[in-house]
């Protein structure tokens, strides 16, 4: 990823990715991509994935608890992926069409995209649409360890840890 230095007083626009710039939930779409690509392995994860999703949506567990209690699914699967960069390219070849048209009309060179989507996946689409500044979740693909979850309140913390008190013109 590429982070920039803001000129004194210059405000930036910050965009959430899923359901703002991207038509849908990229996490769900990447899950479906791997379900088609590797149905036997992904099918094994569906019961626990579903349980985690339901418990989270009902408010029974928080984001960090989801990672703590269910993160091993991601860890175990990530280490089995042979060529993540090839998969990401293939995924965006199929799903790039889900980038909403409005964004190209208002895009500015210093926009920042913030997403729960892992940076390894987010980076490819940002490169394709000309966005240099993005923050996402961080997953070490060699060992499957989740290093940063960029979700809900963590998005603000991630932004501040990278950009400090950079002024924000609009947050979409």
Model-derived features: where do they sit?
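Generic structural signal for well-ordered secondary structure
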Residues: 23-27, 63, 67, 152
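Charged/polar, solvent-exposed surface patches and flexible loops
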Residues: 29-36, 44, 48-51, 68-73, ...
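Short, compositionally biased "basic patch" segments
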Residues: 49-77, 126-134
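Active-site neighborhood of HAD-like aspartate-dependent phosphohydrolases
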Residues: 2-58
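C-terminal cap/substrate-recognition subdomain and adjoining C-terminal extension
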Residues: 2-12, 87-172
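Metal-dependent phosphoesterase signature
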Residues: 65-101
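A general boundary/transition motif marking the beginning of the first structured unit of a protein
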Residues: 18, 37, 58, 72-76, ...
């Amino acid at each position: 990823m590429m982070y920039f230095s803001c000129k004194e007083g210059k405000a930036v626009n910050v965009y959430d990715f899923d359901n703002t710039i991207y038509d849908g939930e990229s996490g769900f779409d990447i899950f479906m991509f791997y379900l088609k690509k590797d149905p036997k392995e992904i099918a094994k994860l569906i019961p626990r994935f579903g349980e985690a999703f339901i418990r989270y949506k009902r408010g029974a567990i928080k984001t960090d608890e989801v990672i703590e209690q269910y993160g091993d699914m991601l860890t175990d699967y990530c280490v089995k992926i042979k060529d993540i960069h090839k998969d990401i390219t293939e995924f965006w070849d199929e799903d790039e069409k889900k980038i909403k048209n409005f964004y190209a009309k208002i895009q500015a060179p210093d926009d920042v995209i913030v997403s729960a989507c892992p940076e390894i996946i987010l980076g490819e689409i940002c490169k394709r649409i000309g966005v240099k500044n993005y923050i996402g979740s961080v997953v070490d693909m060699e060992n499957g360890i989740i290093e940063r979850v960029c979700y809900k309140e963590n998005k603000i913390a991630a932004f501040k840890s990278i950009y400090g008190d950079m002024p924000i013109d609009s947050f979409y």
